[in-house]
């Protein structure tokens, strides 16, 4: 009772537990292109295992200063098994930058605000900004003690350790 990870469960969903659309990443990977029509299937998978957890079809049409992304998928209610066809049309717009150029933004379907990332928590049917769903980051929901332990485990993973907090970690090459 009261061990690591046992506090503050439940409550509002977190960003990490949601499907996320990252606009800069969509441009960087070529899924979105200014002045072009693109389409495809976006896939999400579990990082450790590679198991696919979701896929969403999309089509996008972008002009010089605005455009849209249309997403379509089937959602299954986890309790009743009922399937529902979902579709979101998300507007895109740009804003001039102080040093020149333009930056692309999603227009949130719930709040109308500009966002770089949109999220779809479990059970929701529309992608929206973090504020619309009251999403926090997982670390914000941890107790100070658990947050410190999470940081220690993350640092140990970076150093190549895979065991518990008491396992020996060798020094990385080049560290004296």
Q: For each predicted feature, which ranges?
A:
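Short metal-binding segments enriched for Cys and/or His
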Residues: 133-149
């Amino acid at each position: 009772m009261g061990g690591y990870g046992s506090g503050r469960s439940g409550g509002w969903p977190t960003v990490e537990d949601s499907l996320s659309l990252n606009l800069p990443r969509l441009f960087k990977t070529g899924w979105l292109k200014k002045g072009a029509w693109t389409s495809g299937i976006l896939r999400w998978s579990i990082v450790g295992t590679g198991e696919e957890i979701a896929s969403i079809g999309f089509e996008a049409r972008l002009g010089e200063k605005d455009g849209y992304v249309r997403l379509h998928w089937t959602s299954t209610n986890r309790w009743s098994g009922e399937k529902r066809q979902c579709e979101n049309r998300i507007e895109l717009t740009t804003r001039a930058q102080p040093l020149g150029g333009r930056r692309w933004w999603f227009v949130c379907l719930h709040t109308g605000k500009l966002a770089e990332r949109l999220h779809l928590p479990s059970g929701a049917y529309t992608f929206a900004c973090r504020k619309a769903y009251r999403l926090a980051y997982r670390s914000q929901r941890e107790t100070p003690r658990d947050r410190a332990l999470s940081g220690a485990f993350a640092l140990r993973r970076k150093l190549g350790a895979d065991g518990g907090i008491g396992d020996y970690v060798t020094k990385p090459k080049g560290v004296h």
